[in-house]
Design a protein with these regions (language model features):
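Hydrophobic h-region of N-terminal signal peptides that target proteins for export
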Residues: 1-5
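Aromatic (Trp/Tyr/Phe) and Gly/Pro-enriched flexible surface segments
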Residues: 6-98, 107-108, 115-120, 132-219
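Short loop/turn segments immediately following beta-strands, especially the blade-tip
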Residues: 127-130
Length: 220
Protein backbone atom coordinates (compact mmCIF):
# COMPACT_ATOMS: atom_id res chain seq x y z
CA UNK A 1 0.00 0.00 0.00
CA UNK A 2 1.23 3.48 -0.89
CA UNK A 3 1.24 5.51 2.32
CA UNK A 4 2.20 8.83 0.74
CA UNK A 5 2.92 10.25 -2.69
CA UNK A 6 6.49 10.88 -3.68
CA UNK A 7 7.46 12.32 -7.03
CA UNK A 8 10.44 10.30 -8.25
CA UNK A 9 11.44 12.86 -10.89
CA UNK A 10 14.38 15.10 -10.01
CA UNK A 11 13.97 18.73 -11.12
CA UNK A 12 10.49 17.85 -12.32
CA UNK A 13 9.59 21.50 -12.96
CA UNK A 14 12.87 22.47 -14.69
CA UNK A 15 13.51 25.19 -12.13
CA UNK A 16 17.00 24.04 -11.09
CA UNK A 17 19.34 25.40 -13.73
CA UNK A 18 23.00 26.12 -14.32
CA UNK A 19 22.34 29.25 -16.36
CA UNK A 20 19.83 31.20 -18.44
CA UNK A 21 19.14 30.15 -22.05
CA UNK A 22 20.51 32.36 -24.82
CA UNK A 23 20.21 30.03 -27.84
CA UNK A 24 18.37 26.98 -29.09
CA UNK A 25 19.30 23.49 -27.93
CA UNK A 26 20.52 24.49 -24.46
CA UNK A 27 18.70 21.65 -22.66
CA UNK A 28 21.79 20.96 -20.55
CA UNK A 29 21.04 24.13 -18.56
CA UNK A 30 18.14 22.30 -16.88
CA UNK A 31 19.87 20.23 -14.22
CA UNK A 32 19.44 16.43 -14.28
CA UNK A 33 17.97 16.38 -17.81
CA UNK A 34 19.71 15.27 -21.00
CA UNK A 35 19.05 14.12 -24.57
CA UNK A 36 19.33 10.42 -25.47
CA UNK A 37 19.93 10.93 -29.19
CA UNK A 38 21.18 13.48 -31.71
CA UNK A 39 18.25 15.78 -30.97
CA UNK A 40 18.72 19.08 -29.15
CA UNK A 41 15.72 20.02 -26.96
CA UNK A 42 15.21 23.66 -26.04
CA UNK A 43 15.17 25.17 -22.57
CA UNK A 44 13.03 28.25 -21.97
CA UNK A 45 13.18 30.40 -18.85
CA UNK A 46 11.97 33.81 -17.70
CA UNK A 47 15.58 34.75 -16.97
CA UNK A 48 16.65 34.55 -20.62
CA UNK A 49 18.19 37.86 -21.80
CA UNK A 50 16.69 37.26 -25.26
CA UNK A 51 13.02 37.22 -26.25
CA UNK A 52 13.53 34.04 -28.30
CA UNK A 53 14.22 31.87 -25.23
CA UNK A 54 11.98 33.47 -22.65
CA UNK A 55 8.63 31.92 -21.78
CA UNK A 56 5.45 33.91 -22.48
CA UNK A 57 6.71 34.88 -25.95
CA UNK A 58 9.56 33.03 -27.64
CA UNK A 59 10.88 31.49 -30.86
CA UNK A 60 8.28 28.69 -30.71
CA UNK A 61 5.31 30.87 -29.88
CA UNK A 62 5.55 30.93 -26.11
CA UNK A 63 3.59 30.00 -23.02
CA UNK A 64 3.56 31.13 -19.40
CA UNK A 65 5.15 28.30 -17.35
CA UNK A 66 2.67 25.94 -15.74
CA UNK A 67 4.64 26.57 -12.54
CA UNK A 68 7.81 28.42 -11.70
CA UNK A 69 9.90 30.11 -14.37
CA UNK A 70 11.02 27.52 -16.91
CA UNK A 71 10.04 24.60 -19.13
CA UNK A 72 11.40 22.39 -21.91
CA UNK A 73 10.49 22.25 -25.60
CA UNK A 74 10.82 19.25 -27.91
CA UNK A 75 10.23 18.64 -31.61
CA UNK A 76 8.04 15.53 -31.71
CA UNK A 77 7.18 15.19 -35.37
CA UNK A 78 8.00 16.92 -38.63
CA UNK A 79 7.55 16.62 -42.36
CA UNK A 80 11.21 17.23 -43.12
CA UNK A 81 12.71 13.75 -43.45
CA UNK A 82 16.24 15.04 -42.85
CA UNK A 83 15.37 16.49 -39.44
CA UNK A 84 15.69 14.76 -36.10
CA UNK A 85 13.26 14.17 -33.27
CA UNK A 86 13.84 15.42 -29.76
CA UNK A 87 13.50 13.67 -26.41
CA UNK A 88 14.26 14.55 -22.81
CA UNK A 89 15.60 12.02 -20.32
CA UNK A 90 16.36 11.98 -16.60
CA UNK A 91 17.31 9.52 -13.87
CA UNK A 92 14.84 8.85 -11.07
CA UNK A 93 15.36 9.35 -7.36
CA UNK A 94 15.16 5.60 -6.83
CA UNK A 95 14.59 2.51 -9.01
CA UNK A 96 11.04 1.38 -9.63
CA UNK A 97 9.64 -1.54 -7.63
CA UNK A 98 8.59 -4.69 -9.48
CA UNK A 99 4.81 -4.89 -10.12
CA UNK A 100 4.19 -1.50 -8.49
CA UNK A 101 1.84 0.82 -10.39
CA UNK A 102 3.12 4.32 -11.11
CA UNK A 103 1.11 7.35 -12.18
CA UNK A 104 3.02 9.26 -14.87
CA UNK A 105 1.82 12.81 -15.56
CA UNK A 106 3.10 15.91 -17.28
CA UNK A 107 1.77 19.12 -18.77
CA UNK A 108 2.05 19.98 -22.45
CA UNK A 109 1.20 22.96 -24.63
CA UNK A 110 1.51 23.00 -28.41
CA UNK A 111 3.92 25.54 -29.85
CA UNK A 112 3.41 27.49 -33.07
CA UNK A 113 3.24 24.72 -35.67
CA UNK A 114 0.86 23.17 -38.19
CA UNK A 115 0.38 19.73 -36.67
CA UNK A 116 -0.48 18.08 -33.36
CA UNK A 117 -0.27 14.51 -32.05
CA UNK A 118 -2.83 12.45 -30.16
CA UNK A 119 -0.35 11.42 -27.49
CA UNK A 120 3.24 11.53 -26.30
CA UNK A 121 5.11 8.61 -24.79
CA UNK A 122 7.21 7.66 -21.77
CA UNK A 123 9.88 4.96 -21.70
CA UNK A 124 11.33 3.56 -18.47
CA UNK A 125 14.68 1.76 -18.61
CA UNK A 126 17.27 0.27 -16.26
CA UNK A 127 20.10 2.04 -18.06
CA UNK A 128 20.18 5.40 -19.78
CA UNK A 129 19.24 5.72 -23.41
CA UNK A 130 22.17 7.81 -24.57
CA UNK A 131 24.38 8.52 -27.53
CA UNK A 132 21.81 6.94 -29.84
CA UNK A 133 22.80 7.98 -33.34
CA UNK A 134 19.26 7.90 -34.63
CA UNK A 135 16.86 10.62 -35.62
CA UNK A 136 13.84 8.89 -34.13
CA UNK A 137 13.71 6.37 -31.27
CA UNK A 138 11.24 3.53 -31.87
CA UNK A 139 10.57 1.62 -28.64
CA UNK A 140 7.61 0.17 -26.73
CA UNK A 141 6.25 3.05 -24.68
CA UNK A 142 3.62 4.11 -22.17
CA UNK A 143 1.07 6.34 -23.97
CA UNK A 144 0.44 9.68 -22.28
CA UNK A 145 -2.78 11.38 -23.31
CA UNK A 146 -6.00 12.97 -22.16
CA UNK A 147 -8.23 11.33 -24.75
CA UNK A 148 -8.19 14.20 -27.24
CA UNK A 149 -5.63 15.57 -29.74
CA UNK A 150 -2.91 17.59 -28.01
CA UNK A 151 -3.59 20.76 -29.97
CA UNK A 152 -4.10 23.46 -27.34
CA UNK A 153 -1.75 26.42 -27.78
CA UNK A 154 -3.49 28.67 -25.25
CA UNK A 155 -3.12 26.66 -22.04
CA UNK A 156 -1.38 23.69 -20.48
CA UNK A 157 -2.98 20.26 -20.81
CA UNK A 158 -2.37 17.44 -18.33
CA UNK A 159 -1.64 14.06 -19.94
CA UNK A 160 -1.13 10.82 -18.05
CA UNK A 161 -0.68 7.07 -18.08
CA UNK A 162 -0.26 4.25 -15.55
CA UNK A 163 2.88 2.11 -15.71
CA UNK A 164 3.36 -1.32 -14.11
CA UNK A 165 7.04 -1.59 -13.28
CA UNK A 166 9.19 -4.54 -14.31
CA UNK A 167 11.50 -3.61 -11.45
CA UNK A 168 14.83 -1.79 -11.45
CA UNK A 169 13.97 0.96 -13.93
CA UNK A 170 16.04 4.04 -13.13
CA UNK A 171 15.55 6.29 -16.15
CA UNK A 172 12.61 8.09 -17.74
CA UNK A 173 12.57 9.30 -21.35
CA UNK A 174 9.79 11.45 -22.81
CA UNK A 175 8.97 12.05 -26.47
CA UNK A 176 7.42 10.52 -29.58
CA UNK A 177 8.22 6.80 -29.92
CA UNK A 178 5.40 5.89 -32.31
CA UNK A 179 6.52 4.31 -35.58
CA UNK A 180 3.58 5.62 -37.58
CA UNK A 181 1.99 8.72 -36.11
CA UNK A 182 -1.47 10.01 -36.88
CA UNK A 183 -1.26 13.75 -37.41
CA UNK A 184 -3.89 16.30 -36.56
CA UNK A 185 -3.65 19.38 -38.77
CA UNK A 186 -4.26 22.50 -36.70
CA UNK A 187 -3.43 25.06 -39.39
CA UNK A 188 -4.09 25.03 -43.11
CA UNK A 189 -2.90 28.38 -44.44
CA UNK A 190 0.73 28.57 -43.36
CA UNK A 191 3.40 28.13 -46.05
CA UNK A 192 6.38 28.51 -43.72
CA UNK A 193 8.22 25.13 -43.84
CA UNK A 194 9.43 25.57 -40.26
CA UNK A 195 5.82 25.20 -39.10
CA UNK A 196 5.39 21.76 -40.72
CA UNK A 197 5.94 20.03 -37.42
CA UNK A 198 4.54 19.19 -33.98
CA UNK A 199 6.45 21.00 -31.23
CA UNK A 200 5.54 20.74 -27.54
CA UNK A 201 6.38 22.68 -24.41
CA UNK A 202 6.67 20.38 -21.36
CA UNK A 203 6.43 21.25 -17.67
CA UNK A 204 5.85 19.58 -14.28
CA UNK A 205 6.67 15.92 -14.85
CA UNK A 206 5.64 13.49 -12.10
CA UNK A 207 6.10 9.77 -11.48
CA UNK A 208 4.33 8.63 -8.32
CA UNK A 209 3.37 5.19 -6.97
CA UNK A 210 -0.36 4.43 -6.78
CA UNK A 211 -2.31 1.46 -5.45
CA UNK A 212 -4.84 1.41 -8.29
CA UNK A 213 -5.10 2.82 -11.81
CA UNK A 214 -8.01 4.93 -10.59
CA UNK A 215 -5.58 6.66 -8.26
CA UNK A 216 -3.96 8.38 -11.24
CA UNK A 217 -6.04 11.50 -11.77
CA UNK A 218 -5.61 14.48 -14.08
CA UNK A 219 -4.23 17.57 -12.36
CA UNK A 220 -5.27 21.19 -12.99
Amino acid sequence: MVLFSQNLVINSDFEAKSGCPTASGQFVLAEEWFSPNVGTPDYFNDCSPTLEYGTEFNSRGGQIPHSGHGYMGILCENLHKNQFFEYIETHLKEPLTKDQLYCVKLFVSLGDCDFALNELGAVFSETALKDLQVKKIILPFLPLSNGTPLEDTEKWICIKGVYKAKGGERYLTIGDFEKDDIFVRVRTNNNDPSFKSAYYFIDDVTVEPVDYESGCQYSP
